[in-house]
């Protein structure tokens, strides 16, 4: 083969290789385009199902090792349309209480970053339920948890997290600087009320969707305080009760009507022989019912009911099944304050059904231990101590604490009635458990159902002391 033939042969081979390579590249491009078309079609199909992808990323230190955790969840999208919560439904008929949530925050906090808290409560919008709580500006098992038995300090803040989750810096939302608080949703936005400042001049800061809208200055200069549970929204107006004055004698009690964070009306209760603190309130057929704590002289609970014009009625739960702590043994009740063991108290709640009442209370008469729900079919109006149903939720041997009511509106549940629910604070640490340097709590919650329920104990369950306590 002469040199020219060699050149022609080599050129032909190179051209053939080039053509083959070009064909392969064109095939690759076509393959990628087809694959992309299939994926795009699949994504469009997913969009029809109205789903969204949410990625949670959490970075932390574990035993001096940096760990980055990424968790991608595909969840069905919800209709986030705003609506006014009517609040005009009656309470759902119920036979008992089903466990709804348990956050186990003290157990988790022995090894994880969990806030030191107290006064947790739950409130629901038409889309979700959230746990609100008052932090101490500290984490469990950390040096700043020392001395957190104190109720009022400049480090306390109202925060919230998804219900059932342990409150941590990674899942919690700041709401307000506060050592006393309330919150509720009107269907369009969250109203938060946070009280902070000195005992003789505290100020309540009202926020609507996170923006300050109003302030209320202490009018008696004696520890302005509010509910430590959810406020109530009816037809676009939200209602809350505040107390200012002595905790062991007559004080001043005011109801506030609030629209989009602005106060539109307020009244002072004429109740010289009653004592209202830390009220647990709920809507029922367009009115608001509040069951409160008498820290002055009643071992039964006071109540106040009012309409949207703030026309009100007051009284005490008449049942001989007493709801406060401390309290005497069940016996003869009264529609006025029951003075036996009437001093001091604990935040609590009840639900009225006509002449009957569901009473939530500690199982112990003298300490914040255990918790039970009792159905007294005539307890709202009659003074005997007969009851039909008792459901245990925390055993006598386990710590409890504050408790309060919250409701789930029909706009959330799809029911044609207002579902009654409650939460129980499970306090751990000081002052009762002196092996610790801190005070905090976890929480459980239950909702009323017209089906089978169970007696059991859902305690906090943390093993104390922690490393920081030793």
From Swiss-Prot:
Enzyme Commission number: 3.2.1.18
Gene3D superfamilies: 2.120.10.10
GO terms under cellular component: host cell plasma membrane; membrane; virion membrane
Region feature (Hypervariable stalk region): 36-90
PTM statement from Swiss-Prot or TrEMBL: N-glycosylated.
Activity modulation: Inhibited by the neuraminidase inhibitors zanamivir (Relenza) and oseltamivir (Tamiflu). These drugs interfere with the release of progeny virus from infected cells and are effective against all influenza strains. Resistance to neuraminidase inhibitors is quite rare.
Keyword Transmembrane helix on entry: yes
Membrane topology, as annotated: Single-pass type II membrane protein
Places the protein is found: Virion membrane; Host apical cell membrane
Ranges per topology, Intravirion: 1-6
Disulfide bonds: 92-417, 124-129, 184-231, 233-238, 279-292, 281-290, 318-335, 421-447
Family in the record: Belongs to the glycosyl hydrolase 34 family.
Record's function text: Catalyzes the removal of terminal sialic acid residues from viral and cellular glycoconjugates. Cleaves off the terminal sialic acids on the glycosylated HA during virus budding to facilitate virus release. Additionally helps virus spread through the circulation by further removing sialic acids from the cell surface. These cleavages prevent self-aggregation and ensure the efficient spread of the progeny virus from cell to cell. Otherwise, infection would be limited to one round of replication.
Record protein name field: Neuraminidase
